[in-house]
Amino acid sequence: MLNLVALSLGIEDEALAQIGSSSGYEYVTKWGTQGEGPGQFDGQNDVVPIEESFVIVPDYDNHRLQKFSDNGTFIATIGTSGELEGEFDNPHSVDVDSDGNIYVSDKDNHRIQKFSSEGDFITAFGSEGTGDGQFTHLHGIAVDPVRDFVYATDTENYDIQKFSTDGTFLKSWGSEGEADGQFSSLESVDVDSQGNVYVADYGNDRIQKFDGEGNFILKWGTPGSADGQFDGPAGVAVDSNDNVYITDVNNHRIQKFSSTGSFISAFGNEGEADGQFVQPEGLDVDSEGNIYVADTGNFRIQVFSQ
């Protein structure tokens, strides 16, 4: 997807030092600054690469999506502030299905919007409330492209909801608490090749894993800053080998785990240099293993190879 050889020629020794020479990751590129113009951000909480094509970033407080080439060249803006079809009130998370259609958690409009890969509005579903198919604080979203399911997390309803890709409500699970299958301040969600669902249980500093029907499988993580510990896990991304990547927000780093929760590696620390982060929230991994990180506090996207 990325021309990593060409891009990596510009990598500075400082960037490699920030990542760590033994981490197995290399800084590739970055883009974005704070602002309202094209290619600028105000609260980018997620990022998703669409294979061999482009990258979509929800620009939260600018109430829009931005579309870039895979090396960060600005292409287009999708949406404006509002409540109508194709408009947003704090779009938080984004994912795509196997056809390249884009799904957006339109948080303060309490709905999910679906667009074509070109940004044309297709449909919307959801409303404000606590019932089936309703949202109070819609947050993360993930599409299972093999089985055509959409999963969404709700921070204040403490649940995960499952839909078909046309917006039909299928089921939900979860409640407030610390027990298995309970949550405290839900963040992102993603799905592996087997249809298992991984959720960032931010307030409990852990990751929980379920099957596609909501049955609890396992959990990992405790509060702290050591390997495998978290201080606010937010973003979740599963790669083609079912490894799980987590943005550890207040530890300003990315951690990588096996599908059973075994710690593999970590990279990043607090700062503004290449390879450093300030409260990174969202991330995704493309088919070649390149990691795209929404470096939220630095108002930029960073890309790494491994």
Model-flagged regions — what are they?
Residues 279-306:
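Blade-level signature of beta-propeller repeat domains, shared across WD40, Kelch, NHL, RCC1
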Residues 20-45, 73-92, 121-139, 169-187, ...:
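Gly/Pro-rich loop segments of beta-rich domains
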Residues 69-73, 116-120, 164-168, 211-215, ...:
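Short loop/turn segments that connect beta-strands within beta-propeller blades
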Residues 49-52, 96-99, 143-147, 191-194, ...:
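Residue-level detector of Asp-centered blade-edge/turn motifs that repeat once per structural unit
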Residues 60, 107, 155, 202, ...:
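Short loop/turn segments immediately following the C-termini of beta-strands
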Residues 63-66, 110-114, 158-161, 205-209, ...:
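A short loop-to-beta-strand structural motif that recurs across blades of beta-propeller domains
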Residues 36-53, 57-60:
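Beta-strand-rich domains and repeat architectures in extracellular enzymes and scaffolds
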Residues 54-56, 101-103, 149-151, 196-198, ...:
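Conserved beta-propeller blade signature
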